[in-house]
Amino acid sequence: MLNPWRAWASDTDSTIGKGAIVNAKQLGPKLDFASIQGYETREDAIIYEIHVRDFTSDHDISETLQAEFGTFASFIEKLDYIKNLGVTHIQLLPVMSYYFIDELNRDRILNYTSANNNYNWGYDPHSYFSLSGMYSQDPRNPELRIIEFKNLIQEIHNRGMGVTMDVVYNHTAQMHILEDIEPNYYHFMNLDASPRESFGGGRLGTTHAMSRRLLIDSICYFTEVFKIDGFRFDMMGDHDATTIQNAFDAKKSHQPECFNDW
């Protein structure tokens, strides 16, 4: 059983979850929110959605990379390409820890495959506070992924672009992730008193006090520690309106000019 508020989690052997006690605020560079020239309202946003691993996975650019392909570190090496497109915000597909992946398998997928591979968009969340080790140069190091992600955010901000995160709070990858902590509480419930499923996992019951707090605390954590400029909610309609408004208000209390792509 893993603490859902933990800041680092890993399942590198696909069998046993792991946790570490870290102080993310003390790791990596000191960050601030982006200052974006010409960006006044959300209608001014030019958003580039991108998968961290895909961005540098092309074999043709492998010899130009100093860092391992598909990582936060190699992403930095190609940031100028995005900047030259006139982008205001880089929207990262889910970077929080996700479930169905072997973080130690770094093989490049060169041929088309739709199943039985080690490729994942990240829409199967394992934790709402920890980062995926798939994008770290050493997934065994619980602190490195935090430092590398902060470095990426700093470099994006240094180029006058904002960072928005694609977040998946509507469900978890597996029912037991939250059911093991408190049965029949963290999820919305069916009429037969069983927890409601969604995409094979549990559908987060945001009308329940601690489920709502889990979501809002996660927003605040990534806002305070990583200075994320905005969030894109996956399947936002699965949440109740009060929770979404509270999440927006919490974000805005830290960053009045926040951008929320929901």
Region annotations inferred by a language model:
Residues M1-I47, T56-E63, A67:
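The feature marks proteins involved in alpha-glucan
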Residues G230-F231:
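Active-site capping/gating regions of soluble enzymes
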Residues R53-F226, M235, T243-C258, W262:
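Substrate-binding/active-site clefts of carbohydrate-active enzymes
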